[in-house]
Amino acid sequence: MDIVARIDHALQAALAAHAAPDGPPRLTAALRHAVFPGGARIRPRLCVAVAMACGDDQPVLTDAAASAIELLHCASLVHDDLPCFDDAPVRRGQPSVHAAYGERLAVLTGDALIVLAFQLLGEAAGAAPMRAAGLIGTLARGVGVPHGIVAGQAWECEPQVALRDYHRAKTGALFSAATCAGAEAAGAPSAPWLALGDCLGEAYQVADDIRDVVSNPDALGK
């Protein structure tokens, strides 16, 4: 199984395992809408690739970490598309979650994806609890404060911001978390992989900014 298929299989299993016939059906549908079809799955691919480079001796934990990273990324997109931020009508070639399901359900969808991400790590912790504990901290730093995705989004609410600080928080932090998480899932030191994630995240953001300027929005699917 190639890496993308492995990630999508893990994501499908995670959503299916946490859906219930007596749960809110529109929320269940919105969660799937937010995650599928996926984009390039760059961040979870980095996580799995680093884990494989480090031996990948706990694939269940690797899959949980990669899935959690993608769910956190999807949550950030759902929230970023909201009318109070970008008010984006399209995401990944289909209506954004708030365009398809309404603003209130979009907020709840993003929240639910964040909770599910950390729930997956907790459920996979049995085989290697110390590694899982480290992963929870790594991913929390990648999405939280003071330098994660939430901080990156918060910089948009400030009158002035250093562009590099903004890029590092909004984009780079989760790339760094992905490479470090891959190493941690495999029981390897994460420090050697931190710079790789930092550099890839910054390069990705610059490329994405250029693409936004020179490309047709319809071609971008966002």
Which sequence ranges carry the predicted segments?
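Mg2+-dependent prenyl diphosphate-binding active-site environment of isoprenoid biosynthetic enzymes
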Residues: G23-K222
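N-terminal amphipathic/basic leader segments beginning at the initiator methionine
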Residues: M1-A19
